[in-house]
Regions:
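N-terminal cap/lid segment of alpha/beta-hydrolase-fold proteins
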Residues: 1-40
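Serine-hydrolase catalytic machinery in alpha/beta-hydrolase-like enzymes
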Residues: 42-132
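Primarily recognizes the serine-hydrolase "nucleophile elbow" in alpha/beta-hydrolase
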Residues: 117, 121-181
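Conserved alpha/beta-hydrolase "acid-adjacent" motif
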Residues: 174, 195-201
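Short beta-strand/loop motif that positions the catalytic acidic residue
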Residues: 182, 188-190
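Acidic catalytic loop of the alpha/beta-hydrolase fold
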Residues: 192-197, 224-225
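Catalytic histidine neighborhood in serine/cysteine hydrolases
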Residues: 202-203, 207-225
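Catalytic active-site module of serine/aspartate enzymes centered on a nucleophile-bearing elbow/loop
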Residues: 220-221, 226-243
Length: 243
């Protein structure tokens, strides 16, 4: 991991951009976090729209988390932002747009090719590097982003102890079987009137999760209408499980 820039934000948070091989990312840590008392880490997921476009939302989440005593980090997803375009990813994106415009079912192969084989190993590599930093310790949580990535990470990455998932992206049927293997505590957000999300599929997915502790928080409104207090509830969830 190579840090390429550093700045202190107004809220007493240290923001550092880094690269891990070809993977760009950002790390936020409370300035008060000493190496002698490493802080828990939350991995911030986001849609595959690029870090530059998502930065305002990501930094807002990071500042809120820092106020609660957490470090946070995020990485650029494969084929997004300034990263090189992968032919298989570009083809999957094209297939996804075509299927959605035609109202056709989005098959599992499209979503799997779009994100999972590349994104999950990269998140794990980032976690390896982040946990080597003296100011960061466990436990580790995962928050938001593409729900399929969160599900896969919850299954294959034992260092993730709790997750906040946003049921606002398409989930291939194959992920339902993986959802049954998830056992960590879950806090799931659902926008009830999300026009781009199959509400019943989201409810079925929640039912499929194998976690003994799981809660579903549904709010009226569309995809971008998540109320502020929903974030407060998610913060309390992480404080309960990571502190």
């Amino acid at each position: 991991m190579h840090f390429i820039s550093e700045q202190r934000l107004d809220d007493g948070v240290l923001e550092r951009e880094f690269t891990l091989g070809e993977i760009p990312g950002i790390l936020w840590t409370p300035v008060s976090a000493p190496a002698s008392a490493p802080v828990p880490l939350i991995l911030l997921g986001h849609p595959p729209l690029g870090l530059r476009r998502m930065y305002p939302r990501l930094v807002a989440r990071a500042l809120d988390s820092a106020a609660d005593g957490f470090a946070t980090a995020t990485i650029e997803l494969p084929g997004s932002g300034d990263r090189p375009r992968w032919p298989v990813v570009e083809q999957a994106r094209s297939d996804l747009r075509r299927a959605m415009e035609a109202g056709d079912p989005v098959n599992d192969e499209i979503v799997d090719a779009l994100i999972l084989p590349l994104a999950v190993p990269e998140w794990q590599a980032a976690l390896d590097a982040l946990l080597l930093l003296p100011e960061i310790g466990g436990p580790v949580g995962y928050s938001g982003g593409v729900i399929s990535i969160g599900i896969r990470l919850a299954v294959v990455e034992p260092r993730i102890c709790a997750a906040v998932l946003f049921a606002g992206s398409f989930v291939p049927r194959a992920m339902f079987e993986q959802a049954r293997q998830v056992t960590i505590p879950l806090h799931v957000l659902l926008q009830w009137d999300d026009e781009g999300n199959d509400r019943q599929a989201a409810l079925d997915l929640f039912d499929a999760f194998g976690s003994e502790e799981k809660s579903l928080h549904a709010h009226l409104g569309g995809h971008t209408g998540v109320p502020q207090f929903a974030g407060d509830a998610a913060a309390r969830f992480f404080t309960r499980h990571l502190m």
